[in-house]
């Protein structure tokens, strides 16, 4: 698959493009149109893609699931870019949790009201 961005670089490259779309013409860019519509439109898309991912996961077609997961990741990255949350912050949080029991990590989280 010549010409593809190496997997380790894909998220960062995509994030940079999503940042650039903040100043793009909403008539020419799907992402710019989401930014113009605001957070609620982005959150709605994430919800739709999450539901579609769940439906795809119930079926044996792994390729369909991969496509839905890509849609979900993409729209989550749109939200991250809108909020200026760099992917390194999320991977840093995952690294912080790595090697810790899920039960122990959850118990150590600050309680919210």
Task: List the predicted regions and their residue ranges.
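Flexible "arm" and connector segments at domain edges
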Residues: 1-69, 73-113
């Amino acid at each position: 698959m010549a010409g593809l961005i190496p997997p380790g670089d894909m998220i960062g490259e995509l994030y940079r493009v999503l940042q650039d779309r903040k100043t793009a013409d909403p008539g020419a860019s799907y992402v710019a149109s989401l930014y113009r519509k605001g957070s609620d439109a982005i959150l709605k898309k994430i919800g739709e893609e999450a539901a579609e991912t769940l439906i795809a996961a119930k079926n044996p077609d792994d390729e369909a699931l991969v496509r839905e997961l890509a849609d979900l990741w993409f729209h989550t990255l749109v939200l991250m870019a809108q909020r200026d949350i760099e992917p390194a912050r999320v991977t840093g949080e995952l690294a912080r949790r790595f090697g810790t029991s899920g039960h122990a990590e959850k118990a150590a989280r600050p309680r919210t009201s």
